[in-house]
Amino acid sequence: MTTTSIDPPVYATVDVIREPKAYDGMPKKDECRLPSYSERAITKPVEARKLIRNRLMTKSTTGWCEGYIQANLLVLPAKYRDDFVNLCVRNPVPCPLLGETEIGKPTEFKPEALAKQSNVATDIPFYCEYINGKFSRELENISKEWTEDYVGFLIGCSFSFEAALVAENFIPRHLPTGDAPPMFITNIPLCASGVFTGTFVVSMRPYPEKDLERIRKITSAYTNCHGEPVAWGWDGAKKIGVKDCGKPDFGVPVEFKEGEIPIFWGCGVTPQNVVMMSKLPEPVYSHKPGYMYLTDLTHNC
């Protein structure tokens, strides 16, 4: 099989902690409680991935592994690789490409620093399958589905900057409950690439309007995880096609308090929306929105 040659992708720049130390204080499989934020935060990625792989952790990954980059996953037939890489290059806000796997090898990453001792086909709590642009089924792993002609892509996630918001006492509303944040399909067009076209997906977090500029500044440093917001306020919601902030397309609705406005960030679920709009005939796989891949990469502001 041959593919059209394009310039090598420039992956988002991150640092890496190469030998994470395992944390042994996590709840066992028969415990029903959600680990506290502090328990989730201090767990290292290598240990969290082991818990997920063994089905000991099946919740949303929000709040897990503070300081490390969380990633969205998209797995495609390799014949679409160049088109997808170019889509990310042309649309870096919703699709900040961190790296990819070797074709047919979900345990081998480019760059290698993305993760050690990991299989991206087993180390995410849940996966989604799409066929002809439609959701087909949810899976616990995709080892059998990941054949020798499939390649995976990892895209930065806004969960990665939530610890920075918490440090400034801007605690995301969904974080204490461990739910995925609300996410919305918008009318913001993407720059097309080959077979791929579509619109942005955004994640939303409510905050007091008076804190908007501070929140923009905090998240602007995380360009490899969508950076600062793309829209905010009730008028901003209407402009991007979000009619009801209480009815997300993905994730869980959150409560608004008096004086709060919706703030929207680019979201790595965008590639799933692209797959649905592009209606690829072959099976395509992704993470379940809100259930991310925990990398060994860390952001250095």
From Swiss-Prot:
EC numbers, comma separated: 4.2.1.-
Regions that span the bilayer: none
GO MF: D-glutamate cyclase activity
One BP annotation, GO: glutamate metabolic process
Keywords assigned: Lyase
Tagged with keyword Lyase: yes
A GO-annotated cellular component: nucleus
Any Pfam family matching the protein: D-Glu_cyclase
Top-rank EC class of the record's enzyme: lyase
Family to which this protein belongs: Belongs to the D-glutamate cyclase family.
Protein name according to UniProt: Putative hydro-lyase C5H10.01
Organism: Schizosaccharomyces pombe (strain 972 / ATCC 24843) (Fission yeast)
